[in-house]
Each structure stands twice: as structure tokens, then as C-alpha cells.
A protein has these predicted regions:
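A short, N-terminal "cap"/entry segment at the start of jelly-roll beta-barrel domains
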Residues: 21-60, 102-104, 146-151
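Short acidic-glycine-tyrosine-enriched beta hairpin
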Residues: 53-54, 95-117
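Short beta-strand His + acidic residue motifs that chelate non-heme Fe in jelly-roll/DSBH
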Residues: 70-72, 91-92, 113, 119-125
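Ligand-binding loop in jelly-roll beta-barrel domains
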Residues: 106, 115-140
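Glycine- and acidic-residue-biased ligand/ion/polar-headgroup-sensing regions
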Residues: 65-67, 75-96
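Bacterial N-terminal signal peptides that target proteins for export
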Residues: 1-10
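Conserved short histidine dyad/triad with adjacent acidic residue
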Residues: 58-77, 114-116
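Bacterial N-terminal signal peptides
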Residues: 9-20
């Protein structure tokens, strides 16, 4: 038993010496202006932060400049979770745009788009907007989040 404990301690020491990058990895703040943005929906800028094993986006940032409107899109997509990072997002559901039916979401707001959901639109009517989009193709919401969904 004592011999086994010595071997485990030696193995742990060797592993910490052999993998110093893993043992001391620091977190990194991304510089958003250094990311590669592409134009989407003709008016917004998207930067992909993470991809799945097939190269499909898992996490992305979406910038919408003040005064820009993203037309209805997104029907039938996977489960998506959007977090407003900055600005006030004007949001509407459906194929027909109705500004009177728009809702406003400020920084820290979270919007859930269910898998297979309908179209929606977005606008930056008051200021620039930055969103983080997380795509959950194989995942699902936690029970407390799922309980808040309305159909």
C-alpha cells in the first residue's frame, strides 16, 4: 500500500512537470476589435468565437450599429441562447414586422430561441448593440430555464 502511494505521488509530480501549460493556464480576455467580423443579414457584423467539431459556430458575437434593422430570419434553427452584452436591443417575433409589438432588452438580458422556432427580427433603435449567441445543437436548457419558456 505504501509503495502504491509513493508511485502515485511520483506520477502526480511527473505529470505536473510534464504539463506545465495545463497546470498554470491563465484566463485570457479577448480583444473584440481583433476578431474577424463578417457581414450578416446585410447590416450586422458577426465574429465566431467557438466552433463544433464540424466547424459550425457554437458561440458568436453579433454587432448591430445604431439605426440598423436585421430583417426577419431564423425559422427552424437549433436552440439558441442570446445575451445582450451592451446596448438596448429591439426584438420582435414573427415574419411580419410590427414595431408596436417589439420588446426592448437591455444589457444582461437573456433571450431563448427554441429549436425549430419561428422567425424573429432585431434592431438597434437607440444605440449600438452587442449580443453573444450560443448555439446548442445537441444540448438542452436546464429545467429552471426551460420552465420559463412560453409557446
Amino acid at each position: 500500500m505504501k509503495n502504491r502511494a509513493v508511485r502515485l505521488a511520483a506520477l502526480a509530480t511527473f505529470a505536473s512537470l510534464a504539463l506545465p501549460g495545463l497546470a498554470t493556464a491563465d484566463s485570457t480576455r479577448l480583444e473584440l476589435d481583433k476578431l474577424r467580423y463578417v457581414t450578416v443579414y446585410d447590416v450586422a457584423q458577426q465574429a465566431v468565437l467557438a466552433v463544433d467539431t464540424d466547424g459550425r459556430p457554437l458561440t458568436a458575437l453579433l454587432r448591430i450599429a445604431k439605426g440598423q434593422f436585421v430583417p426577419p430570419h431564423g425559422a427552424g434553427g437549433p436552440l439558441r441562447v442570446l445575451t445582450i452584452v451592451s446596448g438596448t436591443l429591439s426584438w420582435g417575433d414573427g415574419h411580419t414586422v410590427d414595431e408596436a409589438a417589439e420588446r426592448s432588452f437591455g444589457p444582461g438580458s437573456v433571450i431563448v430561441l427554441p429549436a425549430g422556432g419561428g422567425e424573429h427580427w432585431a434592431a438597434a433603435r437607440h444605440d449600438d448593440v452587442l449580443l453573444q449567441i450560443v448555439v446548442l445543437r445537441a444540448g438542452k436548457l436546464a429545467p429552471e430555464a426551460a420552465a420559463q419558456l412560453t409557446r
